[in-house]
Structures are given as structure tokens and as C-alpha cells.
């Protein structure tokens, strides 16, 4: 059986690792051992931060919605509660975008939310409200 030398594959692996380490500072960009450790760590950070990114964007959307809704005299929580009671299903990303780019449409949603909250307050139950809306 022929002897298998793995120079080609290890060279390819090293080349791939060093390419991924391009732009790193110091030994991390040219020494394979340091580069491998740095690349592995960077992949862990990338994996973690893809999850964190989603949290950060949701928090940003909520802050924007809260700021826009307070101009109409509501808080974020009451606004979302009113939307749910009115049966309006719009996600936070779209609400945030509407608040910035389409203030008139966003204002209509705020008024619908206020109307739902006021009607429920005087009617008392959600079932009566849903039958009145339909």
C-alpha cells in the first residue's frame, strides 16, 4: 500500500485559516497556531453575536415605538395592549419603520389602539368589544 503524506491537505487547511485571519493584528495573522486560535475565537463571537444582534434590534425598535407613541400621550405597553385588543397584528419592526417614515399611518394605528382601550374600559369585556368591531 502506498504511503499517504498529508502535506497538500494540511497546507490547504493552513491557507484557509490564514485567509480567515486576514486583517488580524500581530502574530495572529501570520503564525498558524495563533491564527487558528484567533479564528476559532472569532467564530464563537460571531455565533454568539448573531443571537445578540436580534435582541439589540428588538430593543431598538421598542425604544423607537415608545418615543413615537409618547407624542400621542400613550406608553409603549398601553399601545401594544391596545393593538392586541383591537386585533391589529403588526410586528415591532414594521411599527418602528412606520413611526419614522409614515407618521400619519402610525398615528392612525395609535388612534385605533386608543379607541380599543377606551371602548374596553367602558364596555368591560373583550368579547363585547370583538363583537362590536366585527
UniProtKB/Swiss-Prot annotation:
Keywords associated with the record: Ribonucleoprotein, Ribosomal protein, RNA-binding, rRNA-binding
Entries under PANTHER family matching the protein: 39S RIBOSOMAL PROTEIN L20 (PTHR10986)
Alphabetical list of NCBIfam families matching this protein: rplT_bact
InterPro entries according to UniProt: Ribosomal_bL20, RIBOSOMAL_L20_CS, Ribosomal_protein_bL20_C
GO cellular component: ribonucleoprotein complex; ribosome
GO molecular function: rRNA binding; structural constituent of ribosome
One Pfam match: Ribosomal_L20
Provenance organism: Rhizobium meliloti (strain 1021)
Signal peptide residue numbers: none
Designated gene of the protein: rplT
Family recorded in the similarity comment: Belongs to the bacterial ribosomal protein bL20 family.
Gene Ontology biological-process annotations: ribosomal large subunit assembly; translation
Protein name: Large ribosomal subunit protein bL20
Classification lineage: Bacteria, Pseudomonadati, Pseudomonadota, Alphaproteobacteria, Hyphomicrobiales
Protein's job: Binds directly to 23S ribosomal RNA and is necessary for the in vitro assembly process of the 50S ribosomal subunit. It is not involved in the protein synthesizing functions of that subunit.
Amino acid at each position: 500500500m502506498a504511503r499517504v503524506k498529508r502535506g497538500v491537505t494540511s497546507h490547504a487547511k493552513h491557507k484557509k485559516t490564514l485567509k480567515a485571519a486576514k486583517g488580524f493584528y500581530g502574530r495572529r495573522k501570520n503564525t498558524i497556531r495563533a491564527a487558528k486560535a484567533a479564528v476559532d475565537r472569532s467564530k464563537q463571537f460571531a455565533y454568539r453575536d448573531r443571537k445578540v444582534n436580534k435582541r439589540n434590534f428588538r430593543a431598538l425598535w421598542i425604544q423607537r415605538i415608545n418615543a413615537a407613541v409618547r407624542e400621542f400621550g400613550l406608553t409603549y405597553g398601553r399601545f401594544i395592549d391596545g393593538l392586541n385588543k383591537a386585533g391589529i397584528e403588526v410586528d415591532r419592526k414594521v411599527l418602528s419603520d412606520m413611526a419614522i417614515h409614515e407618521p400619519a399611518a402610525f398615528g392612525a394605528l395609535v388612534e385605533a389602539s386608543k379607541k380599543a382601550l377606551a371602548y374596553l374600559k367602558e364596555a368591560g369585556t373583550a368579547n363585547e368589544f370583538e363583537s362590536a368591531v366585527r
